[in-house]
């Protein structure tokens, strides 16, 4: 079924909704994909931009129709029309702003109220920034809800493809699916300290073996 502003294409396509607090970098993230930015359409009835993001896999081309809120979330929650027919989702927070992580459960609840049993990726953005407020080991929500989590840096393109690859594998039911070529991305605006980030990733792995805190606030003590 073609959704508004979604032309029928002869390869698999999926509605991807991106949610999270304002200022977490959702729009910056989506705009990295240059062809999607060039071909985006505005959906005035809901007030979103729909970006068609194409990826090329070993099983052929797939498209994510990526719905971007255009900042409405700053005025409260999003209308159900944003979520309806969503087939996969990304919840984004900013690792330099603790409140954006504390609001992740609310976004998850709103999403799951309308879209049941869809694959969801949690993304901690802005890992290129030095003064992290949310450390890798403090990110536990994905473990409680069985979500995938990736640390990303939209402005440096770090881990850009990983959320899409995870979702593509889940939607295709094929854990061996892989991308055979990279999409054209905007050039990096910042550089990321890969050595420092490798330590964060190690911390993340080590945290998987730790018991979950009863309350997320405990993780910040």
UniProtKB/Swiss-Prot annotation:
Annotated region (Switch-I), positions in chain: 40-48
Family of the protein in this entry: Belongs to the small GTPase superfamily. Ran family.
One Gene Ontology cellular component: nucleus
Described purpose of this protein according to its UniProt entry: GTP-binding protein involved in nucleocytoplasmic transport. Required for the import of protein into the nucleus and also for RNA export. Involved in chromatin condensation and control of cell cycle.
Underlying gene: RAN2
Taxonomic lineage: Eukaryota, Viridiplantae, Streptophyta, Embryophyta, Tracheophyta
Transmembrane segments: none
Subunit structure: Found in a nuclear export complex with RanGTP, exportin and pre-miRNA.
Keywords (A to Z) from UniProt: GTP-binding, Nucleotide-binding, Nucleus, Protein transport, Transport
Stretches the record annotates as Switch-II: 71-87
GO molecular-function terms, A-Z: GTP binding; GTPase activity
Keyword GTP-binding: yes
InterPro entries linked: P-loop_NTPase, Ran_GTPase, Small_GTP-bd, Small_GTPase
Record's protein name: GTP-binding nuclear protein Ran2
Origin species: Solanum lycopersicum (Tomato)
SUPFAM superfamilies on file: P-loop containing nucleoside triphosphate hydrolases
Top-level taxonomic group: Eukaryota
